[in-house]
A protein has these predicted regions:
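Targeting-peptide/extracellular-domain and disordered-appendage signature
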Residues: 1-153
Length: 153
């Protein structure tokens, strides 16, 4: 997201079957998250239509993958070696947007990769502080729900 270019020059794209909803998510959440705030690539990413999604959950301990296809691109995301389920409740003050509360169940992955048209992207899973503990930056979030606190409505 640091480069002001989009696909196919750099692997900077978003693939969705609901562009209107995804633009709402990007504008209302993603642009407010510290990881993406002010990043040159956020405004230049290419928006592509997704025509199919396949999921391979395996046993959810050793491997999980999702493959998206559309606009001439095949995107595969793979997570491996998951830890135990971790229920998460994040208050507005501790959330990435500082505007919403978030509830989810996370499965932390020890390793992960992103593959575009058969070519793995460079990079590695890192560790950082989440919820008072050191966690991998690669995890699955099941039933992730973002809400606006009642006092803000």
């Amino acid at each position: 997201p640091d480069t002001a270019k989009g696909w196919p020059d750099v692997p900077n794209f978003i693939m969705t079957d609901n562009q209107r909803m995804m633009r709402w998510i990007v504008d209302g959440w993603v642009t407010k998250m510290p990881t993406f705030m002010g990043k040159a690539g956020l405004g230049t990413m290419r928006w592509m239509d997704c025509s199919s999604v396949s999921k391979r959950p395996g046993d959810l301990k050793s491997r999980y993958s999702e493959t998206l296809r559309g606009s001439g691109v095949t995107l595969e995301m793979v997570w491996r070696n998951m830890g135990p389920p971790l229920p998460v409740e994040v208050t507005k003050d501790n959330s990435a947007t500082k505007e919403h509360e978030m509830y989810s169940v996370f499965l932390e992955a020890a390793s992960a990769e992103v593959i575009i048209n058969g070519t793995p992207l460079s990079g590695a899973v890192a560790e950082r502080q989440f919820f008072g503990r050191t966690m991998s930056t690669a995890f699955l979030a099941f039933s992730e729900t973002w809400v606006t606190p009642q006092e803000d409505i």
